[in-house]
Amino acid sequence: MAGKTLVAVFSASGVTKRVGEEIARIAGADFFEIVPKEIYTDDDLNWMNKQSRSSVEMNDPSARPEISSTVSDMASYHKVIIGFPIWWGVAPRIIEAFLESYDFSGKTIIPFCTSGGSGVGRSDEELHKNVKGNVEWKKGAQLNRPDETVIRGWLDEVL
């Protein structure tokens, strides 16, 4: 697990954050929460309402929700583990905003997701479009309520 690692996660409900914090603890990595400038309310997250904020964002490929803070020294990280819930079969638009905000050249990006119903789906490949430069991508994993053994096994594969 050589090189400095960052675990960056977006979590609307707290599930992905808990998994990300556990990954960071086990990997000895730094943790960064991707927090939207405007926090999502329960109404915003109502996927059954086509007019909810999350529905509108996910139906607009150009939507990029603002992020409230930045990673202070992204250049110091060699590996970035990015966690997110699956929305509409892919990563939420805020993950695209995060990936477009930094130069990941020469870094390894390792995505993971949480999902109540669907798996990684096409989210893994879709993220590649948002990153410029020479980046090594590791295959994404779905980690729903993993125990320490599962996380360690996954980290051994990707770090």
List each model region and its residues:
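Conserved strand-to-loop "acid loop" that flanks and positions the catalytic carboxylate
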Residues: 84-85, 113
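Structured beta->alpha junctions
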Residues: 11-12, 87, 116, 143
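N-terminal beta1-alpha1-beta2 submodule of the flavodoxin-like/Rossmannoid cofactor-binding fold
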Residues: 1-82, 89-91, 96, 100, ...
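Short, glycine-/small-residue-rich phosphate/pyrophosphate-handling segment
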Residues: 110-147
